[in-house]
Amino acid sequence: KQVPNFEIAYFAGGEPLITEEHYMLIDEMIAKNKTDIQLRYNSNISNFKYKKRDIFKLWHHFSKPIEVYASIDHMGDKAEYIRSGTKWKTIETNLKKLKKARNVGFQVNTVYSIFNALTISHFYKYMIDNHFYTPNSPVWTLYNMGSPEHLSVHVLPEDYKVQALEQLHLTIKYMSDLGFKKTHIHQIEMCIPWLNSKHTWHENQLEFKEEIKRIDTLRGEDFMVTFPELGALYKVPKSLRP
């Protein structure tokens, strides 16, 4: 009943693009010819079809550009480990669809954590080189993970933080050389003071190792294969060995 009064419809998590209620609401908007609504989404962009319905075809009915905030924390097998259930090939395909769509704009949101701190420049370079992120793109938001503390960048030992800092500087230089705006680069710069604001390896290393052991056992994955750059940090504690 409220659809005629809508100006903005913001669909947040879990994952709105695979919920029945979302499609019912979109159908009602179209049926009532209320298609001047600004649609905004938080999504992991894993699914653009639901029960054979293509969201892009529905979006074509709307006059205002659709805004998609894509939650992506890395690429390849690292992305699949960080967000369980992710299929990277599908994410790549859907990024291309978003880039190609005429009435859709998208912005990347990334959680900065121990999982991507030592390879963040590789992720940015991939996104930039494939034109998923350009100097004309909306700002790519980088969120500093605060909790759980044992998976934040604070848990990195000092020598690893030196590498993480180098990764941030490499990303800043690459973006600067390509003409990215200060607002784009500021997101990277804000991670520098955060990286060194706490040093928690000694108090959190056991919890970190227990968490990785739990994840690998539960999912049948291998942290050391996926994150060789962090492998030396992870040795199964004696209390968890067979």
Name these PLM-found stretches.
Residues 27, 31, 129:
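Short, well-ordered alpha-helices that flank and scaffold nucleotide-derived cofactor binding pockets
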Residues 112-118, 135-169, 181-193:
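Flexible glycine/acidic-rich beta-alpha junction loops that bind and position SAM and/or redox cofactors
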Residues 169-242:
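Radical SAM enzyme core and accessory elements
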Residues 56-65, 99, 128-131:
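Acidic (Asp/Glu)-rich catalytic clusters
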Residues 2-5, 62-63, 94-106, 171-184:
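A structural motif corresponding to the C-terminal end of an alpha-helix
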Residues 4-20, 30-52, 59-92, 105-114, ...:
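Core AdoMet radical
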Residues 22-26, 51-56, 88-96, 120-125, ...:
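Well-ordered, non-membrane alpha-helical segments in soluble/globular domains
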Residues 114-131:
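Catalytic cores of alpha/beta
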